[in-house]
Amino acid sequence: NYLVQFPVKYYNLEEILTYGAFSYPVAFLITDLANRRYGKIIARKIVYIGFILGLVLTLCFSTDFSNLISKRIAVGSGTAFLIAQLLDVQVFDKLREKVWYVAPLVSSLIGSFIDTFLFFSIAFYGTGVNWITLSFGDLLVKIFVALVMLIPFRLLIYSVQEIGATKKIN
């Protein structure tokens, strides 16, 4: 995640939060909507497309790849995104028959935890960066945004349903 390189410099948050924390919950929302409407096979395809797009953007716009941390950020970001998103798709699919908010919330929370742990441990373990503190700040924002994303999920799910799904959303 390119945005993880930029700490939030407001309200003394630069030690505990990067802008990367705000982008992944949106990715989970998109995947969950696709999963609800089209099923897990299409949702997985969207994850793979997002992974390839992220890889291309990282190669084109990343900072300094001669820097070991930049390489670790790229590897950590790609690995975390792919594993967390695929897990999100699987968990969502298993919980899809529950009340409407259970699948997107639980899958996003599990995916966010996995994404955060994998990314920060791969990108920053052993580098001297205070990655544990950053990861907690990142995870707290992801949890908050996952809760907020239930609002657009609920609103958008009606649009998704109108496209042609016949199954009622609880």
Predicted regions and their residues:
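Cytoplasmic-side transmembrane-helix entry/capping segments in multi-pass membrane proteins
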Residues: I41-I52, V99-L105
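Interfacial aromatic-anchored transmembrane helix boundaries in multi-pass membrane proteins
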Residues: Q5, I16-L17, L55-G78
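Long, contiguous secondary-structure blocks with strong helical propensity
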Residues: I30-L33, R37, K45, I52, ...
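Juxtamembrane helix-loop boundaries in multi-pass membrane proteins
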Residues: L17-T18, V47-Y48, S108
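Membrane-helix exit/interface motif
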Residues: I30-A34, L59-N67, L86-V91
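Membrane-embedded alpha-helical hairpins and interfacial helices in multi-pass inner-membrane proteins
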Residues: K71-I169
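Hydrophobic transmembrane alpha-helices
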Residues: N1-Y38
